[in-house]
């Protein structure tokens, strides 16, 4: 029974399971194995009710201080003996010598001297029922949603959740995986509640049973830690934490079991009274630096292969015994299953069945041009988009999402479509600051709204009234001092399609040949220095310990040698990585020196405000590029062909843009910005 979730501890989804208070009469009527279930209440009661409990004497009855509102002095506990009678109305036992003791006090004293759940008899179970009722621990298939008020100190009831992820059978499956302390790979289509419900379920399990070595040994020495849901972007941290808070009946984060962790957090997001058993929503960067502060680590959007996320996975495997549980959540295993099975040989795969709540139909619009003929392909694609939106139009008060690959394409497509269609057009991507205001306008629009977006909308924001997706099937993959546009992967297609079908039937219209879809190995497009630096911090062997290995091992070795040339010790690197963003590797030289220059550069990385001190610090790094040639790119812009003169990528040519036709040299400020050397 230790690895199985008793049904009285199901999370109350308020559809099939509700909070329930069990009476002593119901306990008497139960079969022995049904009564046994209540023994597991020992663990949450020890944590949340008995952690500061002691024995008092109230009107000649031994009780616990937590059972009475009276301020009574600590009493010497009685010697326990088997009760000879009981009063179920008063919830009291009477022993051979006439001592009266409450059911819960008897259970407390029994657990204090017991070492195993097997030591608890029916007399002890009665007190566990009383303590569990006070904590609202138990559930049943009957009850009221109103009874969820106060479970976590929440002022409002829990939300009703009919999703598959909180179905009792799925709760049992997830619990068994969690309690076995092995890596869990959780899959499920978009819309089954992976991100919105599974972390909430794991919070519930941690609240009940977290901090104990196993569920058979009784101990009052609880090593309780919070759990963490680690996400690749700040927008996701805010979105999913707000969703969970609301679903647990909270109006604000203060005094809730939820905490947020991301860079430059405003005071409104800080929970000053966070619970030890709670859940932290964190960006990958901060999770990596605080990884062992958590009992359960949940990594979401694993299929995206965010660089820091992949590093976390590598570190978790190296130190898996330091974690109680690891959950990797992904919409699809299309591209990753074989590697995960190789990387985590003891992993458990759990799939949440079912798709979105509503059906999603598909339509394919063929482009007659070869995608290699980019200009002709794009021109026909835009015409096809216009015709498709006319043919497959969202209903009034609904919206459609057009996926393009870049921010600049958002502007181009919006202008093209708005000149040919009578609908309201919006642009949403990661650089837009007022997304909530835009969503309010979209929801208030009585007509049809069309949103042009980058892959940002695949997961970062849920558009509640979206019914149609128009997918160009492309994504821009940045690379050091460049990048290129490629067709999306199967997992990205699934994510985009899953943006609809949540609140009403949806439609997915795609404008690409599915035979073009390929897995995207992002590590081959990335700066590799973070893999090298964190391998120093966590003693990883490269490339053996990496979750995804780069194709070009020579480049990895070049990065290792380049970092070695900085002459910065591993201890200093550890300090720098936990203190600074270090978006540009060379900035570490300034941070290692410290002083005013380091403070100014740090402020620039955090705020974008380039002061004279920060500029001087950057200039001291000699990050130069030579201008080879220039050409006019538009009315007010010139394209500068440049050759990089520093770092691992020295010799690489790239294009920069400026309002003037420059010659000579430029100094790189960031990967994408520079100042001319006049």
UniProtKB/Swiss-Prot annotation:
Motif DEXH box: positions: 300-303
Limits of the Helicase ATP-binding domain: 175-351
Record SMART domains: DEXDc, HELICc
Keywords: ATP-binding, Helicase, Hydrolase, Nucleotide-binding, Transcription, Virion
Binding site for ATP: 188-195
GO cellular component annotations of the record: virion component
Domain Helicase C-terminal: from-to ranges: 371-546
Function of the molecule: NTP-dependent helicase that catalyzes unidirectional unwinding of 3'tailed duplex RNAs and plays an important role during transcription of early mRNAs, presumably by preventing R-loop formation behind the elongating RNA polymerase. Might also play a role in the export of newly synthesized mRNA chains out of the core into the cytoplasm. Required for replication and propagation of viral particles.
Recorded family membership: Belongs to the DEAD box helicase family. DEAH subfamily.
Protein name, as recorded: RNA helicase NPH-II
Organism: Rabbit fibroma virus (strain Kasza)
Gene name of the encoded protein: OPG084
């Amino acid at each position: 029974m230790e690895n199985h979730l008793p049904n009285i501890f199901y999370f109350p989804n308020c559809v099939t399971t509700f909070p329930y208070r069990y009476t002593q009469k119901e306990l008497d009527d139960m079969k022995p194995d049904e009564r046994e279930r209540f023994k597991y209440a020992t663990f949450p009661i020890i944590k949340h009710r008995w952690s500061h409990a002691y024995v008092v004497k109230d009107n000649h009855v031994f009780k616990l201080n937590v059972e009475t509102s009276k301020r009574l002095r600590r009493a010497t506990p009685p010697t326990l003996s088997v009760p000879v009678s009981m009063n179920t109305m008063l919830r009291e036992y009477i022993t051979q010598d006439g001592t009266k003791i409450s059911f819960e006090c008897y259970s407390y004293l029994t657990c204090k001297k017991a070492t195993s759940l097997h030591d608890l008899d029916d007399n002890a179970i009665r007190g566990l029922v009383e303590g569990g009722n006070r904590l609202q621990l138990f559930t049943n298939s009957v009850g009221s949603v109103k009874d969820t008020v106060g479970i976590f100190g929440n002022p409002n009831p829990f939300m009703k959740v009919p999703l598959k992820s909180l179905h009792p059978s799925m709760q049992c499956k997830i619990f068994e995986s969690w309690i076995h302390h092995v890596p869990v790979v959780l899959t499920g289509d978009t819309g089954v509640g992976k991100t919105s419900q599974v972390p909430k379920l794991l919070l519930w399990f941690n609240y009940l049973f977290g901090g104990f070595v196993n569920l058979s040994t009784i101990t009052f020495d609880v090593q309780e830690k919070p759990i963490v849901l680690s996400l690749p972007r700040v927008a996701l941290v805010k979105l999913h934490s707000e969703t969970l808070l609301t679903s647990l009946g909270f109006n604000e984060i203060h005094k809730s079991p939820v905490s947020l962790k991301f860079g430059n957090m405003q005071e409104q997001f800080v929970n000053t009274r966070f619970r030890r058993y709670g859940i932290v929503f964190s960006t990958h960067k901060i999770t990596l630096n605080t990884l062992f502060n958590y009992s359960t680590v949940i990594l979401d959007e694993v299929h995206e292969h965010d660089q820091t996320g992949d590093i976390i996975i590598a570190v978790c495997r190296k130190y898996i015994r330091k974690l109680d549980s690891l959950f990797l959540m992904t919409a699809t295993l299309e591209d990753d299953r074989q590697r995960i099975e190789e990387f985590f040989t003891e992993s458990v795969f759990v799939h949440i069945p079912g798709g979105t709540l509503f059906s999603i139909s598909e339509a394919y619009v063929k482009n007659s041009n070869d995608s290699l003929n980019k200009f002709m392909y794009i021109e026909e694609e835009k015409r096809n988009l216009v015709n498709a939106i006319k043919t497959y139009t969202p209903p009034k008060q609904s919206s459609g999402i057009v996926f393009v690959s870049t921010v600049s394409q958002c502007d181009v497509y919006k202008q093209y479509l708005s000149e040919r269609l009578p609908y309201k057009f919006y642009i949403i991507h990661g650089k837009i600051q007022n997304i909530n205001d835009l969503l309010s306008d979209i929801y208030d629009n009585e007509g049809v709204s069309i949103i042009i977006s980058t892959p940002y909308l695949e997961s970062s924001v849920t558009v509640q009234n979206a019914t149609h997706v128009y997918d160009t099937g492309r994504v821009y993959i940045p690379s050091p001092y460049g990048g290129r546009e490629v067709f999306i992967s199967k997992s990205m297609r699934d994510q985009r399609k899953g943006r609809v079908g949540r609140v009403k039937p949806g439609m997915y219209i795609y404008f690409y040949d599915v035979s073009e879809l390929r897995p995207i190995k992002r590590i081959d497009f990335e700066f590799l220095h973070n893999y090298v630096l964190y391998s120093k911090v966590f003693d990883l062997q490269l490339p053996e310990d990496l979750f995804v290995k780069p194709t070009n091992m020579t480049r990895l070795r070049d990065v290792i040698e380049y970092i070695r040339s900085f002459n910065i010790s591993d201890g200093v690197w550890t300090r720098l990585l936990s203190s600074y963003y270090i978006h540009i590797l060379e900035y570490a030289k300034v941070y290692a020196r410290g002083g005013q220059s380091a403070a100014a550069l740090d402020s620039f990385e955090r705020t974008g405000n380039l002061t004279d001190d920060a500029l001087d610090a950057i200039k001291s790094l000699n990050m130069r590029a030579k201008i080879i040639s220039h050409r006019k790119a538009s009315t007010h812009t010139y394209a500068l062909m440049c050759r990089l003169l520093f770092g691992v990528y020295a010799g690489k040519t790239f294009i920069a843009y400026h309002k003037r036709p420059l010659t000579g040299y430029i100094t790189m400020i960031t990967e994408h910005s520079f100042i001319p050397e006049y």
